[in-house]
């Protein structure tokens, strides 16, 4: 599933687009995300995103700008993790569902980004992986006293160390079904705010 916001060039030379690539997973067993205490640098939050190859150098150049780093689209939530799993690790089919969902959604985002260059219609394409699930979500992390805590959450960012995206981290937004409506609204606003900065010559469509 995909949802996107597009900005077209008035001269007809293609478009810029922010596209949310969404993988939906139904599972009754809880998912546990393992918390990460230190955020990655502001420039890395921008640069380590999935974009079409011919726009990658532009994204790297933009990553050093503070006005780009401060955009909500590139912000990481306080609830951020470096790994996740289902409580029983495997479902009845023997599949690690959270891992499979992460792999599927990142591969889909990379494939869409590459296709934009093949079709030669996109000047700037940004693909953001999102996993939506009805599985109860929990964050497991150390508190300031060094004690292990477990708490229920609705939305988190997964900084997944897997090379499939071509970056040190694949940044994936994890959203519980109950938070989907609120997230959808903010995601639309975030995309609308960033597009004029990514592609100042275009017009929103």
Which residues does each PLM region occupy?
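Intrinsically disordered, low-complexity Ser/Thr/Pro/Gly-rich regulatory segments
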Residues: 3-205
């Amino acid at each position: 599933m995909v949802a996107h916001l597009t900005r077209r060039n008035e001269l007809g030379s293609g478009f810029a687009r922010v596209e949310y690539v969404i993988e939906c997973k139904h599972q009754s067993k809880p998912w546990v995300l393992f918390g990460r205490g230190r955020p990655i640098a502001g420039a890395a939050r921008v640069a380590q995103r999935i974009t079409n190859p011919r726009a990658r150098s532009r994204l790297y150049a933009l990553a050093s700008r503070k006005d780009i780093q401060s955009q909500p689209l590139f912000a990481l939530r306080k609830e951020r993790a470096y790994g996740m799993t289902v409580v029983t690790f495997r479902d009845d089919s023997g599949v690690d569902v959270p891992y499979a969902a992460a792999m599927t959604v990142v591969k889909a985002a990379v494939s869409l980004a590459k296709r934009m260059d093949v079709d030669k219609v996109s000047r700037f394409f940004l693909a953001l992986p999102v996993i939506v699930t009805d599985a109860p979500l929990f964050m497991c992390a150390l508190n300031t006293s060094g004690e292990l805590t477990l708490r229920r959450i609705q939305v988190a960012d997964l900084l997944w160390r897997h090379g499939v995206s071509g970056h040190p981290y694949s940044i994936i937004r994890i959203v519980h079904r109950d938070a989907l409506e609120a997230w959808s609204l903010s995601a639309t606003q975030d995309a609308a705010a960033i597009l004029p900065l990514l592609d100042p010559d275009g017009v929103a469509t």
